[in-house]
């Protein structure tokens, strides 16, 4: 999920 990706980037 995109949300997961964004979380990782954070």
From Swiss-Prot:
It is an enzyme of class 3 (hydrolase). Its cofactor is Ca(2+). It catalyses: a 1,2-diacyl-sn-glycero-3-phosphocholine + H2O = a 1-acyl-sn-glycero-3-phosphocholine + a fatty acid + H(+). Its main location: secreted. Keywords: Antibiotic, Antimicrobial, Calcium, Cytolysis, Hemolysis, Hemostasis impairing toxin, Hydrolase, Metal-binding, Platelet aggregation inhibiting toxin, Secreted, Toxin. GO terms for molecular function: metal ion binding; phospholipase A2 activity; toxin activity. It is found in: Secreted. Binds 1 Ca(2+) ion. The keyword Secreted applies. Expressed by the venom gland. Its EC number is 3.1.1.4. One of its GO terms (cellular component) is extracellular region. GO terms for biological process: defense response to bacterium; killing of cells of another organism. Belongs to the phospholipase A2 family. Group II subfamily. Snake venom phospholipase A2 (PLA2) that has antibacterial activity against S.aureus ATCC 25923 and ATCC 29213, acts by inducing bacterial membrane breakage. Displays a potent inhibitory effect on collagen-induced human platelet aggregation and has indirect hemolytic activity. Does not show cytotoxicity to murine skeletal muscle myoblasts. PLA2 catalyzes the calcium-dependent hydrolysis of the 2-acyl groups in 3-sn-phosphoglycerides. The determined pI of this protein is: 4.6. This is Acidic phospholipase A2 PnPLA2. It comes from Porthidium nasutum (Hognosed pitviper).
